[in-house]
Every structure is written in C-alpha cells, then in structure tokens.
C-alpha cells in the first residue's frame, strides 16, 4: 500500500509542510537541494510518485527497475519536508525552476521516459493553487514553454536505500547535465 509521505522523512505535521518535486533523475535533484538549501529544509528523500498503482503494488514492488522499465508511469521525485517559517513554498519552487529544464516533456538531458518528467506534486489544495500561480509567473522566463505538470500527490514510495544521498556516497556517479543552478 502506498502513502503520500515518505516513511523515513523527518516531518512534524504541527509545524512542517511537504512538497514533492520531479525534475529528472532524482540523484541530481536531491544533490542540488541538499547542496544549496540543506540548512533551510528539514529533510528530503528520493522516491517514486504519481504513478499507476496495481492492487499488488507494495513498497517492495515499486522499484527503480520497474519505474525505469517505463510501465508504471511513476516519476522519480524528491520529497522535501520544510518549515514555512524558515523557507517558503515559493522559494523551493523558484529553485526548482532554476535547476532543471522545465520545458521538456518526459526527459531531462539524455534521460528519457515518463519517470523523468517535470512535475510539482502538491500536498494541499492551497499549495496546488500557489504552485499553478508560480508556474505562470515563470512561463515568460522559459519562453512560455514550461511543460511541468502540477497535480495533487497521489502516491509515494521511498526509493531503495542505495538511492538516498546517492551522489554523496558516489561522488563520481552520474549527474544529469541539466541539473545546475541557472541565473534567472
């Protein structure tokens, strides 16, 4: 059975909020958020979200191999826990639009497939509305071609442990060439 929240993320619902982001390979996404925002976020975890579940899916059956096989429609994502008194949804989303190419559909650099789509998965109706507004404000900066999907979070599965902090554990590991901080 899926959840909407990582089973291992540090998160206090009394003071923290969540956003789940898809911007290509989750290794690079996690690395960028930790490199630039680690002191301002509570925690983050990589996983798989907003795919088509079957009745037989369980946390152990939704895997990197299945997601990359292309038959699940899950996106590789980063779930971020944050205190809105420390960093806002707008700041997290502005950063999102600066660290990948949101104009490509189902790809980032050489990575192709629905698992690499650009997406913002909201954990509340208020966040859904705010994300749509922020996307519209970013449209002119990207030539009015942003392909980022904005949806409510439907489901979330933690990625396997070896994917967590992958580029910290494997400094020479693959990093998508579209993951860099743009001046905009």
Swiss-Prot record:
Its EC number is 1.8.4.11. It comes from the Eukaryota. It catalyses: L-methionyl-[protein] + [thioredoxin]-disulfide + H2O = L-methionyl-(S)-S-oxide-[protein] + [thioredoxin]-dithiol; [thioredoxin]-disulfide + L-methionine + H2O = L-methionine (S)-S-oxide + [thioredoxin]-dithiol. It is an enzyme of class 1 (oxidoreductase). Keywords: Oxidoreductase, Phosphoprotein. GO terms for molecular function: L-methionine-(S)-S-oxide reductase activity; peptide-methionine (S)-S-oxide reductase activity. The modification Phosphoserine is found at residue 58. It holds the Pfam family PMSR. InterPro entries: Met_Sox_Rdtase_MsrA_dom (IPR002569), Met_Sox_Rdtase_MsrA_sf (IPR036509), MsrA_MetSO_reductase (IPR050162). The keyword Signal does not apply. One of its GO terms (biological process) is cellular response to oxidative stress. GO terms for cellular component: cytoplasm; nucleus. Transmembrane segments: none annotated. The keyword Phosphoprotein applies. Has an important function as a repair enzyme for proteins that have been inactivated by oxidation. Catalyzes the reversible oxidation-reduction of methionine sulfoxide in proteins to methionine. Also able to reduce dimethyl sulfoxide (DMSO) as well, with DMS as the product. HAMAP family: MsrA. Present with 3070 molecules/cell in log phase SD medium. Belongs to the MsrA Met sulfoxide reductase family. This is Peptide methionine sulfoxide reductase. It comes from Saccharomyces cerevisiae (strain ATCC 204508 / S288c).
């Amino acid at each position: 059975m899926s959840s909407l929240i990582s089973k291992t993320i540090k998160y206090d619902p009394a003071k923290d909020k969540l956003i789940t982001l898809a911007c290509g390979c989750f290794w690079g996404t996690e690395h960028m958020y930790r490199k630039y925002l680690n002191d301002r976020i509570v925690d983050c975890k990589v996983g798989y979200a907003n795919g088509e579940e079957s009745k037989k899916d369980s946390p152990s059956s939704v895997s990197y191999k299945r997601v990359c096989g292309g038959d699940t429609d899950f996106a590789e994502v980063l779930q971020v826990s944050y205190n809105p008194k420390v960093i806002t949804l707008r700041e997290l989303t502005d950063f999102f639009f600066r660290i990948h190419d949101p104009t490509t559909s189902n790809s980032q650099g050489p990575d192709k497939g629905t698992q690499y789509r650009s997406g913002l998965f909201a954990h509340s109706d208020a966040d859904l509305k705010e994300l749509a507004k922020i996307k519209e404000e970013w449209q002119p900066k990207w030539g009015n071609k942003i392909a980022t999907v904005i949806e409510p979070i439907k489901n979330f599965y933690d990625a396997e442990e070896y994917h967590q902090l992958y580029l910290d554990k494997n400094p020479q590991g693959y990093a998508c060439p579209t993951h860099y901080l743009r001046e905009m």
